């Protein structure tokens, strides 16, 4: 999946996450989390799993996490990525 424009998904409310995606030449992930010291590595692993699932190799990803669950992080990242691309959605990869 090629990222062609900037997109945002999520909120800054408690137990949620805001994900910003922008075009870039390499894959850059920035995590700002209220639970980063405890779960930062797990959050990054979740983000990378979604990026691999959707074949994203170049993008700037900024996550403002407020204690979101794994399923919320996955949903927010997928929503932002789909908003940031002009490619047709491959629904089989979304599962």
Swiss-Prot record:
Superkingdom classification of source: Bacteria
InterPro entries documented for this protein: CitD, Mal_deCO2ase/Cit_lyase_ACP
UniProt modified residues of type O-(phosphoribosyl dephospho-coenzyme A)serine: 14
UniProt KW keywords: Cytoplasm, Phosphoprotein
GO cellular component, one term: cytoplasm
Compartment(s) where it occurs, according to its Swiss-Prot or TrEMBL record: Cytoplasm
Family statement drawn from the similarity comment of this UniProt entry: Belongs to the CitD family.
Role played: Covalent carrier of the coenzyme of citrate lyase.
Entries under NCBIfam families matching the protein: citD, PRK13253.1
Name under which the protein is recorded: Citrate lyase acyl carrier protein
Native source organism of the sequence: Actinobacillus succinogenes (strain ATCC 55618 / DSM 22257 / CCUG 43843 / 130Z)
């Amino acid at each position: 999946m090629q990222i062609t424009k900037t997109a945002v998904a999520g909120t800054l409310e408690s137990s949620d996450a805001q994900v910003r995606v922008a075009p870039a030449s390499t894959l850059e992930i920035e995590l700002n989390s209220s639970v980063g010291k405890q779960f930062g590595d797990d959050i990054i692993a979740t983000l990378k799993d979604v990026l691999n699932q959707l074949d994203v190799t170049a993008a700037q990803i900024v996550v403002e996490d407020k204690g979101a669950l794994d399923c919320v992080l996955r949903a927010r990242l997928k929503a932002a990525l789909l908003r940031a691309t002009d490619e047709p959605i491959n629904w089989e990869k979304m599962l």
